[in-house]
Design a protein with these regions (language model features):
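Catalytic strand-loop segment that frames the active site of acyl-thioester-processing enzymes
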Residues: 2-38
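A generic structural signal for short beta-strands and their flanking turns/coil linkers
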Residues: 9-13, 66-70, 82-86, 96-98, ...
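Generic structural detector for well-ordered beta-strands
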Residues: 12-18, 73, 117-119
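Flexible, active-site-adjacent loop/turn segments at secondary-structure boundaries
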Residues: 20, 35-36, 57, 64, ...
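Short, well-structured hydrophobic secondary-structure segments
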Residues: 38-58
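Hydrophobic beta-strand-centered segment that forms part of the acyl-chain substrate-binding groove
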Residues: 51-85
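HotDog/MaoC-like acyl-thioester-processing domains
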Residues: 79, 89-136
């Protein structure tokens, strides 16, 4: 694996917030009460996707990138029907990890930001390890 990702490379992904993206849709338990606004979990997933897209052109066919660390703040609510854009900017490497600054924004401005780290792994090895770890 030789990845020639340049510092400050960016990638973005957009999402129109719909019902399944809302915090109120996250839990399946009726006693859990969450507001009908863009869920933090969906924001994190969008940020991860942006970072993964920055790495994807450099991966071999048997590789993918996986998130191993994320630290974010979700600072503003977004209602359904609004477009959210998540962005990732490559900061550099820390040993085998690829470090990204991530942020998300809607029409009103920034809604969240943080740091995300990804590792590049062999798909077969990852799946075999996951299966082995959960074997009874």
């Amino acid at each position: 694996m030789t990845i020639e990702l340049e510092v400050n490379t960016t990638a973005s992904v957009e999402l129109l917030v719909e019902g399944q993206d809302l915090a109120s849709s996250i839990s399946r338990e009726s006693e859990d009460k969450f507001p009908p606004v863009f869920a933090t979990a969906r924001m994190v997933a969008l940020m991860e996707t942006a970072a993964a897209r920055a790495l994807s052109p450099f991966l071999e066919s048997n590789e993918l990138s996986v998130g191993v660390f994320i630290q974010v703040s979700h600072t503003a609510a977004t209602p359904p029907g609004i477009k959210v854009t998540a962005n990732a900017r490559y900061l550099g490497r820390e040993d085998k990890l690829f470090i990204f600054e991530v942020w998300a924004e809607d029409l009103g401005g920034e809604i969240g930001c943080g740091i995300h780290k990804r590792a590049v792994v062999n798909v077969d090895r990852l799946l075999a390890g996951a299966t082995r770890r959960n074997a009874s």
